[in-house]
Curated annotation (Swiss-Prot):
Protein name: Heat shock cognate 71 kDa protein 2
Gene Ontology MF terms: ATP binding
Family classification: Belongs to the heat shock protein 70 family.
Main location: nucleus
Location of the protein in the cell: Nucleus matrix
Keywords associated with the record: ATP-binding, Chaperone, Nucleotide-binding, Nucleus, Stress response
Species whose genome carries this gene: Rattus norvegicus (Rat)
Function as written in the Swiss-Prot or TrEMBL entry: Chaperone.
Length: 13
């Protein structure tokens, strides 16, 4: 994931 991961599971969305 990227430095902007703030979603569930820490995935990129």
């Amino acid at each position: 994931s990227t430095a902007g991961d703030t979603h569930l599971g820490g995935e990129d969305f």
